Amino acid sequence: LIFNKSDIVPKDTTGGLDTVAIRMPNHPIAQALIKEAGVSIAAPSANLSGKPSPTLGEHVIDDMDGRIDMIIDGGMVGMGLESTIIDVTVEPPMILRPGFITKEMLKEVIDQVETDKAILTKPTDGLRPKAPGMKYRHYAPKADFRMYDGEEEKVANEIIKVANEKDSQGYVTGILTSDQNKHFYEGKVNDGVVVVSLGDLDKPETIANHLFKALRDFDKMEAQFIFGETFSRKNVGDAIMNRLTKAAGYNIINL
């Protein structure tokens, strides 16, 4: 939640801005840390800017080893996506970053909620996202990541073709799909192509939960090309596609 800050909030913690973002974790270990501290805590994200967000303790070590004093490992995250950011300094309140708390859920609590138009399209000089985490290609793997949108089997056939081409040329290549669509690739992709299912289309929270881990796993195997399917934008799917679109640098091919 973004509020106008009072004088008790140091500007060092807000990047010099007159607003402050307040967030509350739902993990019992994080809540225990806050309770023991007995003070307000400045809590930047536990990853380097531009890297996929951490969902495991080892991801934090990969990014922050030698940069911080301690890591408290609470196990795998419960949701897999960063928090929804909502600006309550404006009327009506505005979503600056979609997350697991969806617009539909917010509307059950407050009548009107808008979405920052800049997060729906590729950033331009005249339309830039207000939230720092929404900048161009922020949630990005090292590989050239392309997504394909269209009828499922048609998309799979195109991905099989381009993935096999890249693999035959000697590139380390990966594919992102779902449990329901994984069968399209079985026996049709080269042995060197790594096919990863993000989860169950009927349970989009499973896709959200595995998204960043999959991107980091591709980084570890030094993938040079990743080809992925798009997903429904319904409910939490909006946040999933927001992260994937940015990870792909808005490189979505419509079939």
Model-derived segments and spans:
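Active-site-adjacent structural elements in enzyme catalytic cores
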Residues: 1-255
